[in-house]
Amino acid sequence: RFLYLGLALSWLLTAALMLDVRSRGVGLGLGVSSFHYALTQCQAVLLYLRLDLWPHPLVFDRGSPLLTSLADAWPYATLLLALVLLALRAWKFSRPLGLVALAFFLLLAPASSFVPVVGATIAENRAYLPSAAVVILLVLALHSLLRPPLVRAACLLLAAAAAAATFARNLDFQSELRLWSDTLAKAQDNPRAHYHLAQIFAAQRNQTAEAYQHYLAAL
């Protein structure tokens, strides 16, 4: 009984945190339609899944790209629907396996469905928790497809590759200049990246021209 009471109290905290989401650019009527946002999430969810399989290239701030037509979104939507149906089939075949597969989509649903997050229509950090489901599925697949010694060897190789990629990515966080330069190199139309670079250059001597160019690009 007390366990359920504690769970219910956590819902109250969640509700309180949700009261002010509109001021942070989350909600309806803020300039991005639910339909266009939902179309964009078809692409976003597949991107998160691909990055879970191999996290490259990672972009700190992808800006607010938006798909506005079915013609642009239907390849993503078709593949996403197929994956959801596959997860439902897995649920029918094996409840634990299906639950893990569905967990990826369910955990993404609050921010990757139809309620627009205007300032960041695609954001890699939303996939942090859902990625646990992908890791579990990968481990189960390796365990079932490979013999135990090969499983250990494969896991060691994957861990080594992931560690190297993590080390390389952490280098981008050594300074604001490096982080936003990397972001701009991968998302060249991102106004926030231009703005932050402009702020960095404006704070330095003899960098006024660079700051001015980035301020113009941010407008």
Features from the language model and the residues they span:
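Polytopic membrane enzymes that build or remodel cell-surface glycoconjugates and lipids
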Residues: 1-219
